[in-house]
């Protein structure tokens, strides 16, 4: 399985660490130059972020960094479809666990049935689906945090692309909103990677967020309730991992 590591070209320290830890284990990979949202999106993607929806229902538009992060994953979903084979997508702030190679060898078997497999720790509740190669395959009830590591099949990538005509949330929230995409979010335990989060945010960076008007706070909370209900209904229907 091809491994792509999303990384800004200028992220010398991060790239050096990735090269060091993966080379030491004889693992082939390829850096994928991340889109720097602070320098603008590729022209064909510029109209996709829906700032008005974001402001109305989530209080603020996507930050330039969030747009760049979404664009980077979007382009790799296109690459997955082009290759017509599952790929492993990693962000450059990860470290491999002792189980990395085992998980990597198991992923093709998981993709015989499932389109998306998270390979990093995830918070929240989950349901056990099955055991593959002595690993536990989980169905995550809430997969709205982090995109440091996951594998995606061409069909799964097509789902994400088909529902990315408008970018209405950050990419990790989008992937986690299974009711929107129809993507069943599974994950393997033990995990292949973890993020020490010791280098701060690079692709996204931090920007000063403006104070949210009271009216938008109300619509934000109403929308949050809507999402909770939709995800609850989705989980009730799909907790067995079946589409």
What do these predicted ranges mean?
Residues 1-90, 94-243:
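An acidic/histidine-cluster motif and surrounding catalytic segment
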């Amino acid at each position: 399985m091809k491994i792509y590591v999303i990384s800004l070209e200028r992220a010398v320290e991060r790239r050096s660490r990735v090269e060091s830890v993966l080379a030491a284990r004889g693992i082939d990979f390829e850096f994928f130059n991340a889109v720097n949202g602070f320098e603008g999106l590729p022209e064909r993607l510029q109209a996709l972020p829906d700032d008005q929806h974001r402001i109305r229902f989530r209080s603020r538009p996507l930050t330039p960094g969030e747009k760049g992060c979404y664009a980077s994953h979007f382009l790799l979903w296109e690459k997955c479809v082009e290759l017509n084979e599952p790929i492993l997508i990693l962000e450059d702030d990860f470290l491999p666990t002792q189980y990395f190679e085992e998980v990597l060898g198991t992923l093709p078997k998981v993709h015989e049935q499932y389109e998306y497999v998270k390979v990093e720790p995830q918070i929240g509740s989950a349901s056990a689906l099955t055991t593959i190669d002595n690993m536990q395959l989980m169905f995550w009830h809430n997969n709205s945090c982090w995109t440091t590591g996951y594998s995606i099949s061409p069909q799964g990538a097509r789902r994400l692309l088909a529902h990315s005509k408008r970018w209405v949330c950050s990419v990790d929230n989008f992937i986690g909103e299974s009711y929107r995409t129809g993507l069943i979010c599974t994950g393997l335990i033990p995990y292949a990677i973890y993020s020490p989060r010791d280098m701060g945010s690079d692709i996204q960076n931090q920007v000063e967020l403006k104070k949210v008007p009271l009216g938008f706070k109300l619509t934000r909370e109403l929308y949050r309730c809507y999402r909770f209900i939709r995800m609850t209904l989705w989980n009730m229907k799909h907790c067995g991992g079946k589409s």
